[in-house]
């Protein structure tokens, strides 16, 4: 599917990542539910912009980078063809074992959120939820 194709979803959830504000806003049925501070990609490895969707929800082990959870997106890095042995896939994930101050641009392209935020998100959203990443 081309990135210019319309993404349709039957879910009432929608996630919007605002790169300039370094915020993630979660909507349900068109109403804003929560807004979270985030870490986004640094200038050399920016978070790609566009219309994407959650491909899968992954529970990570306590020692894993990005634990406790990751929401893998259909987005791919425009810079990194691979990362940490895998494809340059973009995800929303926790801060465990990787850090970064919320509200900064220091990641390799993924969107990092507080661990409690990730627990809240994975309890509500899953595969198919649309994700808009914009500046």
Q: Each predicted region: which residue ranges?
A:
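Exported/periplasmic cell-wall-interacting domains
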Residues: 2-12, 42-51, 58-135
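A structural motif detector for short, solvent-exposed N-terminal "entry" segments of globular domains
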Residues: 2-42
């Amino acid at each position: 599917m081309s990135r210019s194709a319309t993404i349709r979803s039957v879910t009432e959830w929608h996630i919007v990542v605002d790169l300039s504000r370094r915020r993630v806003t979660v909507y349900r049925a068109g109403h804003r539910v929560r807004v979270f501070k985030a870490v986004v990609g640094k200038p050399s490895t920016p978070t790609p912009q566009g219309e994407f969707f959650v491909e899968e929800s992954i529970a990570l082990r306590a020692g894993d980078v990005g634990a406790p959870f990751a929401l893998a997106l259909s987005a791919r890095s425009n810079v990194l063809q691979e990362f940490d042995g895998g494809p340059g896939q973009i995800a929303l994930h926790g801060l465990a074992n990787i850090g970064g101050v919320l509200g900064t641009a220091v990641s390799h392209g993924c969107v990092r959120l507080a661990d409690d935020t990730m627990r809240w998100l994975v309890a509500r959203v899953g595969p198919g939820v649309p994700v808009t990443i914009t500046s």
